[in-house]
C-alpha cells in the first residue's frame, strides 16, 4: 500500500485523506518536517495559498516537497496547491515551490459565490470528469515539457510535468477517484 503525505496545514485535508484511502492508499497528514521523506506520494490540497505558503516555509515542509519532487516522488497539487506548485504566480504574497514550469492566475473564475461544477474532458480519461471549481486558479502559461491535460472555457485547468500533476479544481470533492488513483499508480 502506497503511503501518501497530505499537506495538512490548511484546506481540504480530510477530503483528500478520505479520497486516498478510498482509492486504496494510506494517507498520512503532514503538519511538520520529517514526514515527507517517508512518503511515496504527496498531495498539496486547496485552501488559501498565501496562508499555506507561509506555513510551508515556516515549518520546513516546502524544502522537503521540493526535494521529494526533484527525486521523482509523485505530487498531486489541487486548486491552491496548483498555485503553490507553479513557477510563477500573477499576484499575491505566495512563494511558489516551482514544481511545474507554469504561470498561474489566482481566483481566475471569480469569488467563492461564483463557484461551479462542470464536465471537462481530461487527456487519457475514457469519459468526462465532473470538476468542482471554487475560487479556482487558471494556468496562464506552460513552459517546455508541460502537458495540458484539460481545458475549460478555452483556459488550461489541468497540467502535468513529469511526476507532478496540477489541477485548478477539487477532485477530492467529487467522489471520482481517477486523479487520486493516478497518484497511487505513478
Curated annotation (Swiss-Prot):
Keywords from the named record: Glutamine amidotransferase, Hydrolase, Lyase, Pyridoxal phosphate
UniProt-listed Gene3D superfamilies: 3.40.50.880
Summary of the function given for this chain in its UniProt record: Catalyzes the hydrolysis of glutamine to glutamate and ammonia as part of the biosynthesis of pyridoxal 5'-phosphate. The resulting ammonia molecule is channeled to the active site of PdxS.
UniProt record, GO biological process: glutamine catabolic process; pyridoxal phosphate biosynthetic process; pyridoxine metabolic process
Family: Belongs to the glutaminase PdxT/SNO family.
Catalytic activity: aldehydo-D-ribose 5-phosphate + D-glyceraldehyde 3-phosphate + L-glutamine = pyridoxal 5'-phosphate + L-glutamate + phosphate + 3 H2O + H(+); L-glutamine + H2O = L-glutamate + NH4(+)
Subunit: In the presence of PdxS, forms a dodecamer of heterodimers. Only shows activity in the heterodimer.
Top-level division of the source organism's lineage: Archaea
Active site: 79 (nucleophile), 170 (charge relay system), 172 (charge relay system)
Binding of L-glutamine, residues: 47-49, 106, 134-135
Species for this entry: Methanothrix thermoacetophila (strain DSM 6194 / JCM 14653 / NBRC 101360 / PT) (Methanosaeta thermophila)
One MF annotation (Gene Ontology) recorded for this entry: pyridoxal 5'-phosphate synthase (glutamine hydrolysing) activity
Coiled coil: none
Ion transport keyword on record: no
Protein's name according to its UniProt entry: Pyridoxal 5'-phosphate synthase subunit PdxT
GO terms under cellular component: cytosol; glutaminase complex
NCBIfam families, alphabetized: PLP_synth_Pdx2 (TIGR03800)
UniProt KW Hydrolase keyword: yes
Pathway stated in the Swiss-Prot or TrEMBL entry: Cofactor biosynthesis; pyridoxal 5'-phosphate biosynthesis
Enzyme Commission designation: 4.3.3.6, 3.5.1.2
Amino acid at each position: 500500500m502506497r503511503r501518501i503525505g497530505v499537506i495538512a496545514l490548511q484546506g481540504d485535508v480530510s477530503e483528500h485523506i478520505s479520497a486516498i484511502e478510498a482509492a486504496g492508499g494510506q494517507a498520512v497528514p503532514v503538519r511538520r518536517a520529517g514526514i515527507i521523506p517517508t512518503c511515496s506520494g504527496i498531495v498539496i490540497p486547496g485552501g488559501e495559498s498565501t496562508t499555506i505558503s507561509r506555513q510551508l516555509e515556516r515549518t520546513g515542509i516546502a524544502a522537503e516537497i521540493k526535494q521529494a519532487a526533484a527525486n521523482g516522488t509523485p505530487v498531486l497539487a489541487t486548486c491552491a496547491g496548483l498555485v503553490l506548485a507553479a513557477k510563477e504566480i500573477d499576484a499575491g504574497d505566495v512563494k511558489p515551490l516551482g514544481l511545474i514550469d507554469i504561470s498561474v492566475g489566482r481566483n481566475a473564475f471569480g469569488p467563492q459565490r461564483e463557484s461551479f461544477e462542470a464536465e471537462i474532458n481530461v487527456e487519457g480519461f475514457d469519459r468526462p470528469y465532473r470538476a468542482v471549481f471554487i475560487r479556482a486558479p487558471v494556468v496562464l502559461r506552460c513552459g517546455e515539457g508541460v502537458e495540458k491535460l484539460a481545458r475549460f472555457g478555452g483556459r488550461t485547468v489541468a497540467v502535468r510535468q513529469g511526476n507532478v500533476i496540477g489541477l485548478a479544481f477539487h477532485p477530492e470533492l467529487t467522489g471520482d477517484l481517477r486523479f487520486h488513483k493516478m497518484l497511487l499508480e505513478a
